[in-house]
Curated annotation (Swiss-Prot):
UniProt protein name: Potassium-transporting ATPase subunit beta
Role this protein plays: The beta subunit of the gastric H(+)/K(+) ATPase pump which transports H(+) ions in exchange for K(+) ions across the apical membrane of parietal cells. Plays a structural and regulatory role in the assembly and membrane targeting of a functionally active pump. Within a transport cycle, the transfer of a H(+) ion across the membrane is coupled to ATP hydrolysis and is associated with a transient phosphorylation of the alpha subunit that shifts the pump conformation from inward-facing (E1) to outward-facing state (E2).
Disulfide linkage: C131-C152, C162-C178, C201-C262
Family to which this protein belongs: Belongs to the X(+)/potassium ATPases subunit beta family.
Length: 290
C-alpha cells in the first residue's frame, strides 16, 4: 500500500512525458509509430476532402435551382411603397418647413431635388430607349446588350414646370413648391389592368377655409405610364429608372402646418394598410411661412 501511495518525483514525471513524446525502444511518437501517423493523417485528409466535395456539390445544386434574375429577398407587400422628394424627416415622418422670404430655409430642399433629378438627365438615360407606347412593355427575351432587357427613358424635362429646367427653384420661392412622387420597384408588378396609375394629393386634415388642395401634376394627370412596367429586376434591367410624378401645390395656406397625403390610384395598389403608412401612399407635413 505504501508503494502504491508513493508519489512520483518531478524528474520521474518529466522522464515519462519525454518517453511519451518519443519512445526510442518502440519508435513511437506521441503514442503512435510513424506509419500509424501517416495512415491516420491520410484518413483525415481523405475524410475532409470527401466532406468538402459533398458540401460543394450541395451548394452547386442549390445555386443551379436559383434564378439569377430573381432577387434573393423580396418584400411581402402586394403594393409598392411610395417615396417623396425632397425627403426631410422630423420626429414623426416627413416634415417640411420653410420661409418663402428666406432662401436659406429652402435652398437645401431645392438642392435635394436637383441632385435627385441628375439620374434623369440625358447623360444618365443614354443607355435606355425611347418608348412611345402607353401599354405594358412585356419582354419575353433578353434582347438588350449583355443579356439584359430594355428600359424606357424617363427624362427630367417630362416634369415640365417641376423639372428644375424652367424654374430652378421648383416653385419654392413663390410658395408653390414642387414635390416629386416615386413608387418603389416590385419585380413583375402590374399596377392595373389597362389604366395607368396616377397620383392624387389632398389635404388630410380640415382647414378653416375648407378649400380643397389645388395641384398641377406633371406628366399631365399625374400618371405613371404603363410602359415602365413590369420591372424585371436589377440584373435584367441594370439601367432602369423609376417613372416619376411631380405635384406642384398651388394653394397651401401660409403660416399653418398642413398634413398632405399623396395616394397612388390603381387597380392593384392599396393604401389602407395600418401597419405600413407608406404602402400605396405617402403622407407629409408642410409649413410655408411668409
Amino acid at each position: 500500500m505504501a508503494a502504491l501511495q508513493e508519489k512520483k518525483s518531478c524528474s520521474q514525471r518529466m522522464e515519462e512525458f519525454q518517453r511519451y513524446c518519443w519512445n526510442p525502444d518502440t519508435g513511437q511518437m506521441l503514442g503512435r509509430t510513424l506509419s500509424r501517423w501517416v495512415w491516420i493523417s491520410l484518413y483525415y485528409v481523405a475524410f475532409y476532402v470527401v466532406m468538402t466535395g459533398i458540401f460543394a456539390l450541395c451548394i452547386y445544386t442549390l445555386m443551379c435551382t436559383l434564378d439569377p434574375y430573381t432577387p434573393d429577398y423580396q418584400d411581402q407587400l402586394k403594393s409598392p411603397g411610395v417615396t417623396l422628394r425632397p425627403d426631410v424627416y422630423g420626429e414623426k415622418g416627413l416634415d417640411i418647413s420653410y420661409n418663402v422670404s428666406d432662401n436659406r430655409t429652402w435652398v437645401d430642399l431645392v438642392n435635394i431635388l436637383h441632385n435627385f433629378l441628375e439620374g434623369y438627365s440625358p447623360t444618365s438615360q443614354e443607355d435606355n430607349i425611347n418608348c412611345t407606347s402607353e401599354k405594358y412593355f412585356f419582354q419575353d427575351v433578353f434582347g438588350a446588350p449583355n443579356h439584359t432587357k430594355f428600359s424606357c427613358k424617363f427624362m427630367a424635362d417630362m416634369l415640365q414646370n417641376c423639372s428644375g429646367l424652367t424654374d430652378p427653384n421648383f416653385g419654392f420661392a413663390e410658395g408653390k413648391p414642387c414635390f416629386i412622387i416615386k413608387m418603389n420597384r416590385i419585380v413583375n408588378f402590374l399596377p392595373s389592368n389597362s389604366t395607368a396609375p396616377r397620383a392624387d394629393c389632398t389635404f388630410l386634415d380640415q382647414h378653416k377655409d375648407d378649400r380643397p388642395l389645388q395641384v398641377e401634376y406633371y406628366p399631365p394627370n399625374g400618371t405613371f405610364s404603363l410602359r415602365y412596367f413590369p420591372y424585371y429586376g436589377k440584373k435584367a434591367q441594370p439601367h432602369y429608372s423609376n417613372p416619376l410624378v411631380a405635384a406642384k401645390l398651388l394653394n397651401v395656406p401660409r403660416n399653418t402646418e398642413v398634413l398632405i397625403v399623396c395616394k397612388i390610384l390603381a387597380d392593384y395598389v392599396t393604401f389602407d394598410n395600418p401597419h405600413d403608412p407608406y404602402e400605396g401612399k405617402v403622407e407629409f407635413k408642410l409649413t410655408i411661412q411668409q
